[in-house]
Amino acid sequence: MSASLSDDSLSTHIETMMVEQNPRGMQHLYAKQETGTYLRAAKSLHHAQGTVLIGTGFAVNNTFETDGPVGAIALYKVLEKLGKQPILVTGNPLYSALKNDFNCFELPINSIENARTFSIKALEQLKPDCVLSIERPGLNEHQRYYNMRGIDISEHCGCFDFFITEAPCPTI
């Protein structure tokens, strides 16, 4: 790859590579997305001066999946080196596994009905400059969480959705 690629071109190139061979059909979503997503995300993180909230943890068989938290931890460490204050936002059992080694904020599990109020209060308390989500499920129109097999996993999930939708700062 040429060292003379512009930031925009590099972002588009990386975005394309990430979805080219994705078996989950992400290329169909990417076609509808505005280009430059990765560059905008990088700039949001770069411009954050203080707290960055990193939501992670996807419920799998009464535990958690492992690739999202590893990516979240890697990003946490980079942000820390850059002088930012990252906070991992997750529910149990992942919260308990991470809280002794990282700055963490606990999401209540299976509390969707109180999630918006909880999130707004947490955002006021934590005052983030950026909020991002790595490997988190998202609520559907019925306020439920499902995995890719269509299994309802709501009772095992903490709700991070409103941290994204109610954040007074850039979100990723």
Language-model-detected regions and their locations in the chain:
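Short internal beta-strands
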Residues: 84-91
